[in-house]
From Swiss-Prot:
Family: Belongs to the universal ribosomal protein uL14 family.
Keyword rRNA-binding recorded: yes
Purpose: Binds to 23S rRNA. Forms part of two intersubunit bridges in the 70S ribosome.
CDD domains in UniProt: Ribosomal_uL14
Protein name, per record: Large ribosomal subunit protein uL14
GO cellular component, one term: cytosolic large ribosomal subunit
GO process terms (BP): translation
Keywords: Ribonucleoprotein, Ribosomal protein, RNA-binding, rRNA-binding
């Protein structure tokens, strides 16, 4: 896995509701944990762009609801700072559901994804229609 060059402020914490940006049948996801987060006692785990998270499906098809899955954050409302000084933020918080190998489970990604996620996850970038 490649390091992200931008200064990413974690804009999502445990318990946040985010939209699902793929066509797996899930519409809304709830963050239950953040992979690799090493925080302090009583501090809520936080996630940002490109982080792998564990989510629970709260809205979607009956087959997808109440499943616990892994996902990657592809959009966040909190601005991030790129090395050239520009700041990028999106209209919503969104994630893409992935399998054990880190490849997207869906065949289509709705909406744009960030360039930082595209550099880290090549298979998600090849599925995406727009990279910002």
């Amino acid at each position: 896995m490649e390091a992200i060059k931008a200064d990413i402020t974690q804009g999502l914490e445990k318990g946040s509701l985010i939209t699902c940006a793929d066509n797996t049948g899930a519409r809304e996801l709830k963050i239950t944990s953040v992979m690799g987060y090493q925080g302090r006692k009583n501090r809520h785990p936080k996630a940002g762009l490109g982080d792998t998270i564990t989510v629970s499906v709260t809205k979607g098809t009956p087959e997808m609801r109440r499943q616990v899955l892994e996902a990657v954050v592809v959009r966040q409302r909190k601005p991030i700072r790129r090395p050239d000084g520009t700041r990028v933020k999106f209209e919503d918080n969104a994630a893409v559901i992935i399998d054990d190998l880190g490849e997207p489970r869906g065949t289509e990604i709705k909406g744009p994804i960030s360039r930082e996620v595209a550099e880290r996850y090549g298979t998600i970038a090849s599925t995406a229609t727009m990279i910002v």
